[in-house]
Amino acid sequence: MADNKGVVTTIGRKKLCMAHAGDAFLPAITKMAWGKGGVDENGQPIATTGNEIGLYQELLVKDIELHTYVGDTQTTCRYTATLEAGELDGEEISEMGLYDAEGDLVAYRTFMRKGKDADIPQIYDMDEIF
């Protein structure tokens, strides 16, 4: 199994660094993406590198529905989006990512395959932890 299944990407870390230095504006996270390229031939999640610039087999990108801060310290933000009934029917989802308003993948994770039934929505949360 992969040691590291989720990561803030290199471009995401670069943007954070430059924003903290006051040299750049940090665009908001606005989209969640799902794909089926997050597992190896044995169905195990592949390790993430941080160098990902997109999902390996991206299937769908949607707007973030909401975000919430986890805990009192507000150092984790949970982003939520839903695969509705009728979306990605029959697909096996194994990777997801967060895109910012400039279209850059800033967070990526892999996981075991999740089958998508036609008549059942699936709600996905992805945490950005600082």
Question: What are these language model-derived features?
Answer:
Residues 1-93, 101-130:
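Small cysteine-rich, disulfide-bonded extracellular modules of the LU/uPAR three-finger superfamily
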